[in-house]
A protein has these predicted regions:
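Conserved alpha/beta-domain cores
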Residues: 1-205, 211-213, 225-227
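Gly/Pro- and small hydrophobic-enriched strand-loop and loop-to-helix capping segments
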Residues: 215-232
Length: 232
């Protein structure tokens, strides 16, 4: 099977599964955006995905994403920055990302605001909420109170368009409870801005649980692209 047929088959399978999960949750398939996480995969795959109708791709490595976007022919894609962000990468990230999912501290808001002002740009953002029962430094995410304070900071600057909240299920915990909590933070956020209703949650292992709890943006990698095989 050639690569485009493989991707087509994977996409069909994923869309059918997402549709089934939406039906079980009493939701519309059209209300869910599937982000194809293309990190570590070549620009040729992104071009093929675009040919197959994919509209959203996700990357978490700045240098890789910037180089890849320059090699992708489609201009109709929305590029999502989904990984933890170091402040020294912000200037570069705004050159390729349309949406940032991991705003989790005030320092990041301030640096993005400064760089966006210099570039004369604006950007869509999600505030990342830490869903680990015991917060881990390397996982990213703000506490509930911090997330709401970050949302207020984002809303006070016209360079940002606040989309909603983002979360990553705990490595060793109850994904359903975690996503229920994220949904409750989303409701609180919407008291600040009723239009910031999006929930970025759900990856290849837990997207059905995320859909049940209101996820609007799924970040799916291996289900669409497959698994990397390494030699040596």
């Amino acid at each position: 099977m050639n690569r485009i047929d493989e991707l087509r088959l994977n996409l069909t399978t994923v869309k059918n599964s997402v549709q089934d999960a939406c039906e079980r949750a009493g939701r519309k398939f059209e209300d869910v955006t599937i982000i194809a996480v293309t990190k570590t995969w070549p620009a040729s795959d992104v071009n093929l995905l675009a040919q197959l109708g994919v509209t959203d791709v996700g990357e978490n490595r700045d240098q890789e994403a910037k180089a890849k976007k320059s090699e992708v022919s489609s201009t109709n894609l929305t590029w999502h920055a989904i990984g933890q962000i170091q402040t020294n990468k912000v200037k570069s990230i705004i050159q390729w990302a349309d949406v940032v999912h991991s705003i989790d501290r005030l320092e990041l808001v301030e640096v993005f605001a400064k760089q966006l002002a210099h570039a004369g740009k604006s950007i869509d953002v999600f505030v990342q909420v830490n869903l680990d029962e015991v917060p881990r430094d390397n996982r990213g995410g703000a506490s509930t109170d911090e997330a709401l304070a970050l949302a207020q900071a984002v809303l006070s600057n016209e360079a940002f368009r606040l989309r909603g909240v983002m979360g990553v299920a705990p490595l060793h915990g109850d994904a359903n409870r975690a996503f229920e909590h994220l949904a409750s933070v989303s409701q609180a956020l919407m008291q600040l801005d009723p239009t910031a209703s999006a929930i970025s949650a759900g990856m290849s292992d837990d997207y059905e649980i995320a859909i049940k709890n209101g996820a609007t943006h799924l970040r799916l990698g291996s289900l669409i692209l497959g698994h990397r095989t390494y030699s040596g």
